[in-house]
Amino acid sequence: MRTIKLILEYDGTNYAGWQLQPNGLSIQEVVEGALARLLKEPVRLRASGRTDAGVHARGMVAAFDTDRSIPLRAFSDGLNALLPPDIAVRSADEALPGFNPRFAATGKHYRYTIHRGERRSPLVRLQSWHVRGALNLAAMREAARHLTGERDFASFRTAGCAARTTIRRVDAVEISDDGEMLTVDVHGSGFLRNMVRIMVGTLVEVGRGKLTPEHVAQMVVCPGVVPAGPTAPPQGLCLQKVRF
């Protein structure tokens, strides 16, 4: 039995997220369907996590087991021939038997993209959040510093989050300015549901002057008591890389 590790890139616009859904087409369903056609057998993927509807990925990691002896290149080339244009296999490699990306992962890197143009852009609307008006980047960066380290992020999760603990370690929150485009890179050991999007929505409120960096500091000092800002929309978020 072989275990194959895939690195997947996808545009999540037209999907109900990564995970199989009773109502709605998921990325997992599409990739498993392509694998079943390629290998002539049913396949169940083990993923490094899940992305919500509309969220993208450049480095989703998934693994599966198979007895087939086809070359690695045939996995990537064969799948890419069967997958739709908005999903692609970036690489296929042998992994240790039974490798499970979810439990083996030691960290993730997410990137959130904000479009700050005076007018909305049809060309970037599916990969960014259009935020009108000036943003105070110095205040946003000061607020971001309060979100690094091992902290209780109870204020930064969606109501449906079922995580047993809200303690997470965030290694870095980096805000980069490239003219009309602003990127927020978040590196950490793991994240609560919608945590990165709530962090970004909160930082934008700081940039608009509606919240202060000190208010953000209180969100992790008094978790679940001091409310966070709004949840940024899904289309600006992309899973860049999973660390092992």
From Swiss-Prot:
* PANTHER family (UniProt xref): PSEUDOURIDYLATE SYNTHASE, TRNA PSEUDOURIDINE SYNTHASE-LIKE 1
Q: Where is the signal peptide?
A: none
Which residues bind substrate per the record?
Y110
Pfam families the record matches: PseudoU_synth_1
UniProt keyword Isomerase present: yes
The record's listing under InterPro entries reads: PsdUridine_synth_cat_dom_sf (IPR020103), PsdUridine_synth_TruA (IPR001406), PsdUridine_synth_TruA_a/b_dom (IPR020097), PsdUridine_synth_TruA_C (IPR020095), TruA/RsuA/RluB/E/F_N (IPR020094)
Name its species.
Answer: Geobacter sulfurreducens (strain ATCC 51573 / DSM 12127 / PCA)
> Which GO terms label this protein's molecular function in UniProt?
pseudouridine synthase activity; RNA binding; tRNA pseudouridine(38-40) synthase activity
The protein's name is: tRNA pseudouridine synthase A
Sequence similarity: Belongs to the tRNA pseudouridine synthase TruA family.
- The record lists its disulfide bonds as none
Alphabetical list of NCBIfam families matching this protein? hisT_truA
Keyword Isomerase belongs to the record:
yes
Cited function: Formation of pseudouridine at positions 38, 39 and 40 in the anticodon stem and loop of transfer RNAs.
Where does the record place the catalytic residues? D52 (nucleophile)
Q: Outline the subunit composition.
A: Homodimer.
